Amino acid sequence: MNPSAPSYPMASLYVGDLHPDATEAMLYEKFSPAGPILSIRVCRDMITRRSLGYAYVNFQQPADAERALDTMNFDVIKGKPVRIMWSQRDPSLRKSGVGNIFIKNLDKSIDNKALYDTFSAFGNILSCKVVCDENGSKGYGFVHFETQEAAERAIEKMNGMLLNDRKVFVGRFKSRKEREAELGARAKEFTNVYIKNFGEDMDDERLKDLFGKFGPALSVKVMTDESGKSKGFGFVSFERHEDAQKAVDEMNGKELNGKQIYVGRAQKKVERQTELKRKFEQMKQDRITRYQGVNLYVKNLDDGIDDERLRKEFSPFGTITSAKVMMEGGRSKGFGFVCFSSPEEATKAVTEMNGRIVATKPLYVALAQRKEERQAHLTNQYMQRMASVRAVPNPVINPYQPAPPSGYFMAAIPQTQNRAAYYPPSQIAQLRPSPRWTAQGARPHPFQNMPGAIRPAAPRPPFSTMRPASSQVPRVMSTQRVANTSTQTMGPRPAAAAAAATPAVRTVPQYKYAAGVRNPQQHLNAQPQVTMQQPAVHVQGQEPLTASMLASAPPQEQKQMLGERLFPLIQAMHPTLAGKITGMLLEIDNSELLHMLESPESLRSKVDEAVAVLQAHQAKEAAQKAVNSATGVPTV
């Protein structure tokens, strides 16, 4: 060990180049002989949970960490040599460039260990890496010395030397900004000219004659294939920049043998790719800005609606620049886009058309979002809800959450103050008779706190008094851990019981329909008038659900009806997460939920997004626990 090495109070090591399947247990087994370990964390992608290829190992004593660094660097774990270095949490020290050198033109056989062994003679190395892709070494690497003096010695002694019979370049590391600045300066003084589109009959001599009038040329080359046939492009290298600039100015765009030739500054492949990428990003940003607030996403479209019909339905709200129904194999995919000329027109269309029945289905209309925006929005919503759950002393449980084998429940997300309190299915079973609701109209108290419901005149009893005195009812602990309980599947609501259980009062609707069937709960004693047969959502073992049935139900029952049909479908995809996902999806508009019940593809897409959000949250919690354990902060 090097006694002059700097002190690292955290005694934390960075372990890179890990095999994707390497786990914390494997790393513990590898590093524990060096000394007592506080914690190990393999860093993973928040969404996919796949290893990012590096980890942190925190020792109790810096001496143990240094021993591991000296004796275990480049040891093999699961067939891959790992790269170990001190964990430097201050990015300014890592990115300063002090002591960092760049080596290029390396032989393919040179790996991290060989590079380390070669340069360790010049001083203490903090990190060393040969850059690789899926095909192996890319021929260059970096060595970061502890001191600038060691780096300068390495440059002086090794630059131009042979390494595995190849002459290597060793120089000071330059940041991308520095390299781009140098590249820009060189570009202004270019002497090499690129010419293309001159046909197959051009050779070196003709090209030299064509460009020789602008000044003396160092070299002229027409690129050819194996048979000696011209590829249609070539290069001319002038002695002076002024001659090259004059050739570009005069020859670019001129006709040669009936073809318009291109003449410009010769660029390296990296330069061309960078410029193309910048142009593409600029075009993408311009397109996003142009359509911001004017492009609408329309789904739950009837199969008979085409581009013309879609344009016709939305044309009363303003000037439409484009209307497109997405097709697959000549059949509608059930969604499309309408682009207006101004944000005001688009906003008006969303307000008027969202929920309106066109043909046989209620439309879902919203401003179009990119996939990244939707996922970011969902993730943000979920994180906010979880934060509010932790703030609640006794969170209540989602009614669609089954009792998993582990005995852990996910607390329901508290909504606005007038939303219903959710209970576990076993509690709901205790609070009501075996049928869902009796013919006498008795309804359990927990649902009386939903929007639009009539609250009793008497003061509502406290939450604790509403819990039946039964040992079978689980107590909701602050840690969200409860005993394993049996769940009762909630069946469909019979029509007669629904009518008897619903008070004949005016309530605020949560769902919007066309004039013929809009707000039917304002006249609950009359039969809703539906002019055409509406498609019904069939879930095995349950009553078919149509848009008119949903509209005729009071607002507080609509989510319940949708949830009972969503839960078994989601349970078939993700049995252990069905309750959490159902609770998340019930936050979506009713029209979109109906469409998801009719379209398995749409449902699966939303379920996948919800799963991604859950995984991201779990990853964040796991990372927080790892940080807490490393710093000694107790976790709750």
Swiss-Prot record:
Q: Which GO terms describe its cellular component?
A: cell leading edge; cytoplasm; cytoplasmic stress granule; lamellipodium; ribonucleoprotein complex; spliceosomal complex
Q: Which residues carry this modification: Omega-N-methylarginine?
A: 385, 419, 432, 436, 475, 481, 493, 506, 518
Enumerate the spans annotated as PABC domain.
Answer: 542-619
Start and end residues of each RRM domain: 11-89, 99-175, 191-268, 294-370
Molecular functions (GO terms) = RNA binding
Per its UniProt record, what PROSITE patterns does this chain match? Answer: PABC, RRM
Q: How is it modified after translation?
A: Phosphorylated by MAPKAPK2. Methylated by CARM1. Arg-493 is dimethylated, probably to asymmetric dimethylarginine.
Residue positions where Phosphothreonine is found in the record: 319
According to the UniProt record, list the residues that bear N-acetylmethionine: 1
Q: Which locations, inside or outside the cell, does it occupy?
A: Cytoplasm; Cytoplasm, Stress granule; Nucleus; Cell projection, Lamellipodium
Q: One Pfam family this chain carries?
A: MLLE
Keywords (alphabetical) are:
Acetylation, Cell projection, Cytoplasm, Methylation, mRNA processing, mRNA splicing, Nonsense-mediated mRNA decay, Nucleus, Phosphoprotein, Repeat, RNA-binding, Spliceosome
Q: Which residues carry this modification: Dimethylated arginine?
A: 493
Task: State its role.
Answer: Binds the poly(A) tail of mRNA, including that of its own transcript, and regulates processes of mRNA metabolism such as pre-mRNA splicing and mRNA stability. Its function in translational initiation regulation can either be enhanced by PAIP1 or repressed by PAIP2. Can probably bind to cytoplasmic RNA sequences other than poly(A) in vivo. Binds to N6-methyladenosine (m6A)-containing mRNAs and contributes to MYC stability by binding to m6A-containing MYC mRNAs. Involved in translationally coupled mRNA turnover.
Recorded family membership: Belongs to the polyadenylate-binding protein type-1 family.
- Which named protein is this? Polyadenylate-binding protein 1
Give the organism the record lists: Pongo abelii
Instruction: Report which gene this protein is encoded by.
Output: PABPC1
